Regions:
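A short, Lys/Arg-rich alpha-helix, primarily the initiator
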Residues: 1-16, 23
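Alpha-helix N-cap/N′ positions at the starts of helices
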Residues: 2, 33, 89-92
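Helix-turn-helix DNA-binding elements, focusing on the entry/boundary residues of the two helices
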Residues: 7, 18, 35, 54
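Short alpha-helical "recognition helix" segments of helix-turn-helix
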Residues: 21-25, 57
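DNA major-groove recognition helix of helix-turn-helix/homeodomain DNA-binding modules
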Residues: 49-67
């Protein structure tokens, strides 16, 4: 499933219009995202948003933060490399992740 279809399906399950959901998602400056921007996200015409907006979408749509980051193809800031990880540790983490997905 694409990022857009995941948020669209979750929004519909919550019986929210695009306008209602957009009004609940605030940019870093405190203003709401536009319904058109949300529409573009749902139709995969825009790249998934930043962590600030992803966290809010997860909360409003009752999706786990981890799942939403996964379908967005990104990592939360707390998982981004600090530059001290060895290539072996990173590879081991990805192998563990793949094993968990196959269960």
């Amino acid at each position: 499933m694409s990022f857009g279809s995941v948020i669209s399906d979750a929004r519909k399950r919550r019986s929210l219009s695009q306008k209602e959901l957009a009004s609940r998602i605030k940019k870093e400056d405190g203003t709401a995202i536009s319904p058109q921007y949300l529409n573009d996200l749902e139709r995969d015409r825009r790249n998934p948003p930043n962590q600030h907006l992803l966290d809010q979408l997860a909360g409003q749509l009752q999706l786990t933060r981890e799942y939403l980051f996964y379908v967005a193809g990104t990592y939360p800031d707390d998982l981004k490399p600090a530059g001290t990880e060895s290539p072996e540790r990173v590879a081991a983490a990805f192998r563990a992740f793949r094993r968990a997905l196959q269960k």
